[in-house]
């Protein structure tokens, strides 16, 4: 547990450093090893790429115990901090969720407000903040400074669900920050103007998803840094790029 506490403290400190963190999203020990060897200070595990790599599907369709077994293999294979995407929590209480990710060796979580196991119900803003607050409390009781990355799909869901998705996203990331999230993740941002509005709304790092080759709709890594972005992950995009590139190369051999 002492090593876990040290990793968590380092990860939390990295998030408070005001520097831009790039945390590539991995799915197995091979991809995790590549990230560590490349010199990154931490990594993220994505539910989507893990599901694709294990013959399952995303949206909380994986068996959680099996998922945590994958996480444990990855955390055992690297020496850098690992954060895991837990979607909306897989139906677990915040305390149980924190206990299980710590057991698997992770020191961060990404938790979203769309509950896939309940017909893709969107949690109310305060409900989601309360879930994050309870997870924060559970981590504090365990004595591990878990980095909670609070995700909202408000912008991604758009005007079909919210009258003003950007206003809703801002409300939600503020509540998540107040609840103890160390970073916030408003998915679906595609322009510099959107990114700036969200960055200006909170003091914690704002996470954006970027493509490892094509960057983000707002620009490349330097542009994102200039906009105030302090955390970048890849979601399923690195894995998809590898798959697409490999498929093109393999065609000549078929």
For each predicted feature, which ranges?
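Alpha/beta enzyme core
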Residues: 2-82, 86-236, 240-243, 247, ...
């Amino acid at each position: 547990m002492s090593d876990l506490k040290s990793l968590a403290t380092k990860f939390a400190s990295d998030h408070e450093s005001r520097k831009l963190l790039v945390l590539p999203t991995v799915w197995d020990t091979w991809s995790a090893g590549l990230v560590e060897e490349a010199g990154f200070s931490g990594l993220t595990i994505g539910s989507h790429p893990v599901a694709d790599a294990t013959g399952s599907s995303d949206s909380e369709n994986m068996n959680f115990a099996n998922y945590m077994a994958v996480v444990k293999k990855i955390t055992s294979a690297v020496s850098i901090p690992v954060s895991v995407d837990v979607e909306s929590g897989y139906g677990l209480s915040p305390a149980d969720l924190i206990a299980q990710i710590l057991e698997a060796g992770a020191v961060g979580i990404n938790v979203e407000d769309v509950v896939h196991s309940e017909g893709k119900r969107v949690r109310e803003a305060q409900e989601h903040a309360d879930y994050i607050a309870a997870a924060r409390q559970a981590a504090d009781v365990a004595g591990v400074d878990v980095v909670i990355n609070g995700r909202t799909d408000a912008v991604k869901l758009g005007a079909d669900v919210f009258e003003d998705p950007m206003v809703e996203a801002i409300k939600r990331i503020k509540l998540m920050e107040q609840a103890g999230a160390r970073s916030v993740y408003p998915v679906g941002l595609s322009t510099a103007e959107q990114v700036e509005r969200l960055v200006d709304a909170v003091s914690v790092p704002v996470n954006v998803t970027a493509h490892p080759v094509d960057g983000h709709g707002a620009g490349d890594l330097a542009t994102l840094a200039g906009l105030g972005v302090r955390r970048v992950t890849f979601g399923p995009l690195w894995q998809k790029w590898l798959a697409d590139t490999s498929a093109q190369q393999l065609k000549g051999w078929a």
